[in-house]
Amino acid sequence: MPKLSFASLLLLCAASAWAAIPRAPAGAPGPYDAKAWRADWPDCAWEDGVSEGRLSVVSRPTGQRWRVDYAPGRIGPSEGGTAWNQSFDGRDEVILSYVVRFSPDFDWRRGGKLPGLGGGPGKTTGGRRADGINGFSVRPMWRADGNMEAYAYHAGQTKDYGDSLSLPKTFRLPRDQDVNIRLRVRLNHPDRADGLLELKVTYGQTTAEVTAQTMVWRKAPTLRADKLLFETFHGGNDLSWAPERACHAEFGDLRLE
């Protein structure tokens, strides 16, 4: 058997790092319970919303998808959506992409979170401020009337909650149509403000994006991008963000590169 080159071994290791990230649910259409979730995400230590029955599997011509049901009058993943975090081998640059489809009756309300990326030993969401050592996070976020932004916790933030980097105000997310999300993060040199954040959203012939090239994600070289944040829920920190009616969204074709 021929020996693999060093470059080939690096590629093999990189491929194995992503192997734990499923592109779509493996099971048949129907309920997606904790057992099915564990089979797809065996390395995740916790979840919100799965055991409560807010996830299911649906089939589309392009493949299986996760369906998340958002509870009316509720915010956050523990009561009104779902969340889990999947670790992967740390990198200085990562691209996350997936397809999301909002239900025909989707209630944007004031806004809510979509799956994103994070890194570091701490939890930098929910008002827990990033300091360049404890970690960072960035998640796409829908806003009222279907506008959209990247919502980032980073070392350059000046308040406890994250900063909003908005797409053009004229942009509107559609309901009942596939939307392609592409989120790119490149970490800064620890002594420079040269990090990258790029969010690109496409549906049909419509594309919108926001880019920031002076992000300070970290202050230590050991901090790297190493988490997929599969989090989606309405909120916001009070019930004014809660949907007034039941609605859902589908997620599929999940990729890291």
Task: List each language-model region with its residue ranges.
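Bacterial N-terminal signal peptides that target proteins for export
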Residues: 1-8
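Hydrophobic h-region of N-terminal signal peptides that target proteins for export
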Residues: 10-19
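Low-complexity, Ser/Thr/Pro/Gly-rich disordered linker/stalk regions
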Residues: 20-257
